[in-house]
């Protein structure tokens, strides 16, 4: 089987490249097996690691994408269609079309499903601002969790009950974010959300999901400390929680380092009896100066390797999900910062390229699974 080192060595040779549909594919990619026992999910299963990805509603209509999804992954999460805003166009009304389609696909292919998410400060319904008050916000939140959680009860491996509740720079007590939920209900919205979720779907793993807590920077250290403190309060108060989701939106070419901080975060969660999931993994390549796709892929793959080698040291890490499958669908291309910094260059942050062919990150992820201890 080809290794990451062999792949990157081959990818760096100009003679290995073929121009296809505006992207560069390497001979190594076409020749090496990637399905069956060579798939990401099979390499993950050997180590007891669930292998997943976020799926957009439009992508799920593509038959080639469907085949790739079923071949490579055993866990899926909806990119947007289970969020409050996309689900609820009017108060009390829900459009289940896209969410149901993903659940049906996953069940057909015997894949697990992550629910994302019940409570978040962003992507709220258009009606929320004018409708929600301090008098009715609790009912809106509880009804929403009951409605969505109840519809998919018993079908969801884990729910991101609360997403991104920490924002130290907001200056609120305990580093909590000054979100609409906080302002309308107060900090008790957190405990209420988890108790409601447990009541609604007792078998789902209840997760707290957060970003910007992974690297060794001072800002990440502050947010990491606030996150671990929140989890400790949950445990002390009897708030039902089973897992920490580390989003893992990280960067290549920027000098970010991962080591002490990641180990501190994962061990802190593990000591509280929590499982750990890497929930939204991708590697932003805007910081890589060279425009050559081979150079960028090598840089991105190196970050995947370094990050996963550290994270997967711990048997507490039970799942690795990338935020998307192929470069053609990544959300990073829509970011304002990307459009301003690299207006003529599309991101290559994921394990498959625009043509659904494996990139260097594919082999980096697969090799990282092989090196991880069995859990």
Region spans (language model):
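N-terminal substrate-binding region of glycoside hydrolase catalytic domains
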Residues: 45-100, 112, 117-132, 245
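Aromatic-rich peripheral "rim/lid" segments of glycoside hydrolase catalytic domains that contact
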Residues: 35, 160, 164-170, 175-183, ...
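N-terminal export signals
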Residues: 6-28
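Substrate-binding cleft and catalytic face of glycoside hydrolase catalytic domains
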Residues: 77-83, 98-213, 285
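Conserved, mostly hydrophobic/aromatic
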Residues: 76, 106, 159, 244, ...
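C-terminal segment of N-terminal export signals and the immediately downstream linker at the start
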Residues: 23-54
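Short, acidic/polar
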Residues: 58-70, 140-145, 222-233, 304-307
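Glycoside hydrolase catalytic-domain groove-lining segments
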Residues: 107, 187-192, 201-208, 224-290, ...
């Amino acid at each position: 089987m080809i290794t990451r080192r062999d792949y990157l060595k081959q990818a760096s040779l100009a003679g290995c490249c073929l121009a296809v549909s505006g992207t560069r594919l390497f001979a190594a990619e076409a020749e090496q097996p990637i399905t069956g026992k060579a798939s990401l999910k099979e390499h993950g299963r050997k180590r007891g690691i669930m292998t997943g990805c976020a799926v957009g509603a439009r992508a799920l209509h593509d038959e080639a994408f469907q085949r790739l999804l079923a071949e490579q992954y055993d866990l899926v999460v909806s990119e947007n269609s289970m969020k409050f805003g996309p689900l609820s166009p009017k108060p009390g009304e829900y459009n289940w079309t896209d969410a149901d389609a993903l659940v049906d696909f996953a069940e057909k292919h015997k894949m697990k499903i992550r629910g994302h998410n019940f409570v978040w400060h962003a992507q709220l319904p258009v009606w929320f601002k004018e409708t929600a008050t301090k008098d009715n916000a609790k009912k809106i939140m509880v009804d929403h969790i009951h409605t969505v959680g109840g519809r998919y009860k018993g079908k969801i491996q884990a729910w991101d009950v609360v997403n991104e509740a920490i924002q130290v720079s907001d200056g609120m007590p305990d580093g909590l974010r000054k979100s609409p939920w906080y302002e309308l209900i107060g900090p008790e919205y957190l405990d209420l959300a988890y108790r409601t979720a447990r009541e609604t779907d007792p078998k789902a793993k209840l997760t707290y999901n957060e970003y910007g807590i992974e690297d060794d920077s001072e800002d990440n250290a502050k947010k990491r400390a606030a996150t671990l403190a929140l989890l400790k309060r949950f445990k002390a108060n009897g708030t039902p929680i089973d897992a920490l989701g580390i989003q893992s939106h990280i960067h290549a070419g920027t000098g970010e380092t991962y080591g002490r901080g990641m180990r501190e975060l994962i061990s802190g969660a593990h000591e509280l009896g929590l499982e750990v999931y890497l929930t939204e993994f991708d590697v932003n390549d805007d910081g890589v100066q060279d425009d050559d796709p081979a150079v960028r892929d090598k840089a991105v793959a190196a970050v995947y390797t370094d990050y996963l080698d550290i994270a997967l040291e711990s048997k507490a890490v039970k799942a690795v999900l990338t935020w998307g499958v192929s470069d053609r669908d990544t959300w990073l291309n829509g970011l304002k910062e990307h459009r301003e910094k690299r207006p003529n260059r599309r991101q290559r942050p994921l394990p498959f390229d625009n043509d659904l062919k494996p990139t260097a990150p594919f082999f980096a992820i697969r090799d990282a699974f092989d090196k991880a201890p069995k859990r």
